């Protein structure tokens, strides 16, 4: 089974605009989100929404709407700040605050977390212990694909348990394309032909591996404002946005998806889960 996951954030949060400036930008969250929700309803699919605490405070009715529709509400931190740019104390405060905000809205325990920009890296593995201490049991923050922003290249390509604290890690799912390792979701989904992602999921299914697909609401909104930014980031953010909707429609029609909590539960019920020391991620 595969996971359909959404980082619930607005377009300006995805391009690293300072937290203090967010109110100055046009809010367009529902422009893309409503299109995505129509697809999920059409294909009878439940998703996990990794939600910013700030979004929860601003749109509590939306969060309740998502939860009532059968989607899982998970944490994406509060301010979309990268974990490795925070102190442990600041990180603890953010994930505790966000957990309380989201649970107060839905009445449902928040157990899963994804760091903004997959920013649990070699420099911020301390965050895994804090997640456990703050009541989280699933983390989806580590990417085996190393980029200028994130990644731990020797991350196991499977769901696994962190030996030291019991956290279940569901890393970014990848597939092989010739000599390259690519992620499944986000900019990879738009930049390459749909068949690349489809073949990636088939490749993983044939190997008996679960897949974590990820996307953002602003990727369904090709008309959100274009602003000046670093060249590489601008390319990955804005390129081929009009492909997201038709590609996602095909994906949801050809593969089955569920929430991360349900998929992890099913995975554990089928047999033993690999356990790795956090030291393997530091190697």
Each language-model region and where it sits:
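Catalytic alpha-helical scaffold of carbohydrate-active enzymes acting on polysaccharides/glycoconjugates
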Residues: 1-112, 117-177, 196-283
């Amino acid at each position: 089974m595969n996971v359909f996951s959404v980082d619930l954030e607005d377009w300006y949060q995805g391009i690293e605009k300072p937290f203090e400036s967010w109110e100055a930008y046009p809010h367009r969250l529902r422009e893309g989100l409503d299109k995505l929700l129509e697809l999920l309803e059409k294909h009878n699919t439940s998703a996990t929404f990794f939600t910013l605490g700030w979004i929860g405070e601003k749109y509590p009715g939306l969060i309740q709407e998502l939860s009532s529709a059968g989607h899982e509400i998970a944490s994406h931190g509060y301010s979309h700040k990268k974990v490795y740019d925070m102190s442990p104390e600041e990180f603890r405060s953010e994930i505790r605050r966000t957990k309380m905000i989201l649970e107060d809205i839905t009445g449902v325990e928040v157990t899963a977390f994804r760091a903004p920009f997959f920013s649990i890296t070699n420099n911020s593995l301390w965050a895994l212990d804090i997640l456990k201490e703050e009541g989280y049991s699933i983390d989806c923050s580590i990417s085996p694909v190393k980029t200028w922003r994130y990644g731990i290249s020797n991350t196991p390509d499977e769901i696994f348990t962190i030996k030291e604290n019991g956290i279940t890690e569901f890393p970014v799912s990848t597939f092989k394309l010739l000599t390259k390792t690519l992620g499944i979701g986000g900019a990879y989904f738009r930049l390459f032909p749909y068949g690349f992602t489809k073949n990636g999921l088939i490749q993983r299914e044939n190997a008996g591996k679960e897949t974590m697909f990820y996307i953002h609401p602003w990727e369904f909104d090709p008309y959100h404002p274009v602003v000046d930014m670093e060249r590489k980031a601008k390319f990955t953010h804005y390129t081929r946005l009009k492909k997201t909707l038709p590609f996602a429609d095909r994906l949801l029609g050809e593969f089955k998806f569920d929430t991360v909590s349900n998929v992890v539960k099913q995975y554990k019920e089928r047999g033993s889960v690999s356990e790795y020391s956090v030291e393997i991620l530091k190697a």
